[in-house]
Amino acid sequence: MVGRLKESPSQEMIDLLFKPSIRSDLKHHYSYLLKINSVHLFMLKSEGIISDEAASKIHSVLTHLQVTGKEALSINPALEDLYFNVEAYIIEQTGPEIGGQMHTGRSRNDILATVTRMRIREEMLEIYELVCTLRRTLIDLATEHTSTLMTGYTHLQPAEPITFAHYLSALLHGFERDFTRLYNCYAHINKSPLGSCALASTTFSINRKFTMELLGFADLLENSLDGIASRDYALEALSALSIFSNSLSRFAQDLYTWCSYEFGYLEVGHSVAVISSIMPQKKNPVTLEHIKAKAGHIQGALVSSLSVLKNTLYSHSRDTSMESMKYTWEAINETKAAIRLMIKTLQTLTVHKDNMAATTRQNFSTVTELANALVRHYHFSFRTAHHIVAEIVNETLNQGLGSDKIEASTVERAIKQVTAKTVSVTKEFVEQALDPERNISLRTVRGGSAPVEVARQLQQLEQTLASDHQKISDLKQALQSADQLYKHYAAELERGAQ
């Protein structure tokens, strides 16, 4: 019999709900729960709500649990959760009149809300560092390839010549925004719900700011009901993770395509590929396949959490506090795995520069600049020049040739056909207009693909990355300072017990 219940939990409740939850909490939440217990205890003593003697005895048991680890507990799943098992152990060691004081002025509702925020805060910090490592890897790779010629594609058709660095710079700008979105989640995560109690706070004169500071939170949730009901911070994090995973998946798809034999632009290393059981020639870039798939899992977690929360009351319930968070942790793990796989894949990447350049010279991606040259030198309107070059492309393709074989006579015939004008075109004019390196070098406008402009972009990306590293360092330093304060109060309590 527990509380007002006259029967023990059913075996189904124990096997399907309590045991899995306790296993997960022991693995992931044990240290957070003990720290919350200790901080709440320090506060109760500081405010004179419990005696120094009671605080000292309880703290001694909590310290033992921290030092010994979860193995110190003999878990009884019928007690429902990890909190009740910890409390039962403390009461067993100190007696009900001492150990029972630990729960003064709080509820499992605000405890679990606090645990969840502390865990997701730590997980997000790890993701911030991984995203920055990915950006560092990309900046280093781009710096090596500011002059590496390649084709830019739209609709997966040759469009215009760019450099590999210009492509990577585009991704870096996207990942920079992803970092900002992920970082901005932290301010909403890092607010303390502790002291909200069940939902209406408490009649004990607790000091919420005290526990907030020792647990490393930057602010308080100002409404006790909101403190135990809110899970929007998790949805916000899942949304940012989903957007980031989408960016990462699109990147993986490009690499995957360019690693094919038909493109032959890139090749992943042997350490990140697998073979076929039957086809000897195979070297499959499977890390990219997993990265793409993991984006689906992450986005599915967002939809799952939204779906669970949408019909819950704005208060505490198990579907709010537990079921809605079920796949959040999996999404976080999938995100970390996807980033690590991408970093490793990039570190092994071989760029086949010759293939990239040869394809770009032949696949008509340079002919837009031929149209531009006709506008500048022969004063055609751009639309007329567009028609002329379209005729040139058709004639060249019909001859089974590439754009590197376009001749001055071909241009003259197309001009005659479209405008009925006879114009003399030199070989040098055509070669210069179709030269991909020259084509790219002229694109010096801000954001353009000229090597000098891409170098400027990379320098700016480098500066922002350094700033973002500092932001992470500041967040970690704040937690370390809070931990030092926590250790101060722990030592003070231990000295008083001597």
Curated annotation (Swiss-Prot):
One Gene Ontology cellular component: cytosol
Disulfide topology: none
Highest taxon in the source lineage: Bacteria
Keywords annotated in UniProt: Amino-acid biosynthesis, Arginine biosynthesis, Cytoplasm, Lyase
One Pfam family, short name: ASL_C2
Cross-referenced CDD domains: Argininosuccinate_lyase
Top enzyme category: lyase
Localization: Cytoplasm
Coiled-coil spans in chain: none
Alphabetical list of HAMAP family matching this protein: Arg_succ_lyase
Protein's name in the database: Argininosuccinate lyase 1
Species for this entry: Shouchella clausii (strain KSM-K16) (Alkalihalobacillus clausii)
Upper taxonomic lineage: Bacteria, Bacillati, Bacillota, Bacilli, Bacillales
